[in-house]
Design a protein with these regions (language model features):
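Membrane-proximal interfacial segments on either side of biological membranes
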Residues: 1-100, 109-200
Length: 200
């Protein structure tokens, strides 16, 4: 068995790198002009070997980023995100995901959200807050979507959600705390390659 205590960090990734992480099944590769600061760091700590695995933490911060695909009328005017996670498969400490903030502005769209998933390896407890107005018609002209992907419509949401994943799976309404508003207009998400279609 080996004791591991490792810190890692990447300061080099750019917003362009982040944009290129969007799966090519949905978005074509293209020329991107992008700005902003991206930081990635974390730790690997614990024992490895003899059925033991170290715990892993990952932190991602994106500050004041912007991006635009060449030839498209809209772009991302401002994008900020602060995400942290901790995974301990040996369950010595609680595992979690924590999106402290996600702020997106551009293409007639404004998204402000935070979310947390606690008890990640047991029965995840999900907490989500968002205030968002989304113009999918404009977003469809922000990213070079593949021909099989269609997004359109408008969404206005101000939501607070708290529940266990098991309650969502069972559709146990009595155990799902959900409040706020959600308005959809001419809303459609479609991927013909995966035979997926959601519209309202």
């Amino acid at each position: 068995m080996v004791g591991v205590n490792l810190k890692y960090g990447l300061h080099a990734p750019s917003m362009e790198t982040v944009m290129n992480m969007i799966p090519e099944a949905y978005v074509k590769r293209g020329q991107i002009s992008a700005k902003g600061e991206v930081k990635v760091d974390g730790t690997l700590e614990g024992n490895y070997g003899n059925k033991q695995l170290p715990a892993v933490s990952l932190n991602i911060k994106i500050n004041d980023a912007s991006a635009r695909y060449e030839g498209l009328p809209y772009g991302i005017d401002n994008f900020t995100a602060d995400f942290e996670s901790y995974i301990d498969l040996m369950r010595r400490n609680p595992s979690f995901l924590n999106l402290k903030i996600l702020h997106f502005e551009g293409a007639h769209t404004k998204i402000l959200a935070d979310a947390k998933v606690e008890d990640l390896l047991i029965d995840p407890l999900i907490t989500l807050h968002t205030e968002s107005t989304v113009d999918l018609d404009a977003l469809a002209k922000t990213f070079p979507l593949q021909e099989n992907v269609t997004i359109r419509g408008k969404l206005d949401a101000g939501l607070n959600l708290k529940c266990r994943l098991s309650s969502l799976k069972r559709q146990d309404i009595g155990r799902i705390r959900l409040g706020g508003r959600l308005a959809l207009k001419d809303f459609e998400l479609k991927d013909t390659a995966k035979d997926f279609n959601f519209f309202r």
